[in-house]
Amino acid sequence: MDVYFIRILDGQGDYDYDLETPFLEKDDTIKTLKMFESMLYVNSSPVTYYQWFNMLIDIVNTDSPVEPEILFASLKSKDDEAHPKEKLKYDELNYEDVDRYWFWRLDFQIWLKRKELFLVGDDATPQNNDIRRAIDVAEKYVFKRNRSIEHIAPQTPLQEDTLKLEKEDRNCFGNLVMISSEQNSALSNSIYQEKRARVESFLDSSRSGSIESLKMLHAFTFNKSWSLEAIKEHGDTMYKILLQSYD
């Protein structure tokens, strides 16, 4: 039965996950299941870990092997019940009230739909190097714990910023990402252009670092500048992705 559970290959921080099932030929489905279990794991704590762990045990506690697509659908259904769509309210996705679970769920959904979300129009071919690079980064995304909420447009910029926001707009979902405390410290009070340049340097490997939020990747990929209009549009797009994750 333990073959259905993710294993952390390296517990020192730069970890990856492994997952064994009897259906090795279904690589794409197994990867989706592994990513979903990883999302549930990083969202858990020592207190809540066994909630999703027990959900998985209930599904695989059978004499017959469980197909990975059935296991994923069943596990996601149980998670949907634990986090019902009715609790997903845009006004509550703000800096002061948001449950970090929604950021994890959003990153999983962006990973799952990465090609269609980063492609433009009906063309199945990436439009430029930035899009191709973003899809590649999303493909290799790894869920990690120890995340904190960061403002894209900072609360107290280190230098003069032409973007002036009311507190409600600054703290809204469209202006938030969830990253590590280390990256948060490095980026926290930088203006948008500096943050985007730093993320670009992560992408082209000119600076050490990684993309810790697919929501952030999407924002920086499609917005060369940051404005109240861009914040609202990004927030609406991300909220729509969350809603569609229940379909």
Question: What label would you give each PLM region?
Answer:
Residues 1-247:
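Flexible coil/loop and intrinsically disordered segments
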